[in-house]
Design a protein with these regions (language model features):
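Conserved, well-folded catalytic cores of nucleic-acid-processing
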Residues: 54-57, 69, 81-89, 110-114, ...
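Helical mechanochemical/support elements of P-loop NTPase systems and associated helical scaffolds
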Residues: 18, 43, 47, 62, ...
Length: 381
């Protein structure tokens, strides 16, 4: 008897396919993964045009770290992001972990955020201040809010700072007893393992603020073979889990902005009106790692407007030749004037000096917003 053609031979049953096996596995273990959840993604402005361009439009859900010296601008920038988060993300609430004991009246007024200290007052668009420096307690609150979120809220957490936290065990010890070595690093790792995926997938954001620490060298002449991304505290886990790591550099005299920039500082005749914040991007999601960003702060402003956006906008306007500075005058091109006119915005053609143009823009916020959005849409790729 001859052999049957291949197309007539019975097909051997090999069992479920790889697709069906995977499908069954996902269903059986649905409580252990996030594949069935829709990812919630957005961008929140940093408040600075230059930093928004560097971050491709702002910060996304997930963990971010702000590190650096004191008075570098870490807390102010974290609150700037929080303000924009509460304004632009639907059903949003914020939570500030006050672990260092610093949240002055002046900082609150500058931020433009409504801070509350009771659970009953914690409405959408507000920030609850949790005054606690016990690592386990802070971690459990974050974990509970993220994992038990039947209301569908979007949370932003600011931890100020990682260095102010201690373990519960260490808090019960006397001053003479030894504390747990690398206790914060261990718990940081445990915390991020528990919440990192849910934090980014479900559209929550966290900013952890850290100080910098000096390395102790037994031999100051020995070669340094230890390559470190930063000198921030909290262990390596926070470095790996973070989307963005921004290092705020110290402020020096040359970073100050004077009333008369070309003259020497004088307490009466030439006052300090602001300063430039300098940031090094230590980790990024868009290949801007190790690049430097600078943005100006204007003193005396309140309600979340301390970033001197007019200053940044003018720099970009002149850089892209939408206006030219010749002699004592700054003159806008006819093309850009016509472009704004189509948006029902009237732009004055000539201004006597950059300072007068800056004052003009401060009085015409819609024009600033138009240029800001134009540069973001063009440059923040």
């Amino acid at each position: 008897m001859g052999r049957k053609p291949k197309d007539q031979e019975p097909v051997q049953d090999t069992g479920p396919s790889a697709k069906s096996r995977l499908s069954s596995f996902l269903k059986e273990n649905k409580d252990d993964h996030y594949n069935y959840e829709e990812e919630i993604y957005y961008k929140v402005s940093t408040g600075s045009l230059n930093l928004d361009i560097a971050t491709s439009g702002g910060l996304c859900p997930g963990l971010h770290r702000f590190i650096g010296m004191n008075e570098g601008g870490k807390t102010s920038e974290a609150l700037e992001v929080m303000k924009n988060f509460l304004k632009t993300v639907k059903d949003s609430k914020a939570l500030l972990f006050k672990a260092e004991g610093r949240l002055s009246k002046e900082i609150k007024e500058r931020s433009g955020i409504k801070f509350v200290t009771s659970a009953e007052e914690w409405e959408d668009g507000t920030c609850f201040v949790f005054e606690c420096n016990i690592f386990e307690t802070v971690s459990e609150l974050m974990k509970d809010l993220i994992q038990n979120n039947d209301e569908g809220k979007r949370y932003m957490f600011v931890l100020d700072s990682v260095d102010g936290l201690m373990t519960k065990g260490d808090s019960l010890k006397s001053m003479t007893e030894a504390t747990k070595v690398a206790g914060g690093a261990v718990i940081s790792s445990m915390l991020m393992k528990r919440i990192s995926l849910a934090l980014s997938k479900r559209g929550h954001m966290a900013i952890f603020i850290s100080q910098v620490r000096s390395d102790i060298k037994l031999d100051p002449y020995a070669a340094n073979k230890d390559i470190r991304q930063t000198t921030a505290t909290g262990g390596n886990a926070l470095l790996h889990f973070a989307n963005w790591i921004l290092e705020f550099e110290p402020k020096f005299g040359k970073d100050l902005i004077l009333e008369k920039p070309n003259e020497r500082y004088d307490q009466v005749k030439n006052k300090i009106i602001g300063h430039n914040v300098k940031i090094v991007i230590k980790k990024s999601t868009n290949e801007t790692t190790n690049s430097k960003v600078q943005y100006p702060i204007k003193y005396g402003r309140k309600d979340g407007s301390s970033v001197w956006r007019e200053y940044e906008v003018i720099d970009q306007i002149l850089s892209w030749e939408f206006a030219s500075a010749k002699g004592a005058w700054v003159t806008f091109t006819d093309e850009i004037i016509e472009e704004l006119k189509k948006e029902n915005l009237e732009l004055k053609k000539q201004h006597q000096g950059v300072d007068n143009l800056r004052s003009y823009l401060e009085d015409n916020r819609p024009i600033v917003d138009y240029f800001y959005n134009k540069f973001i849409n063009t440059l923040a790729l």
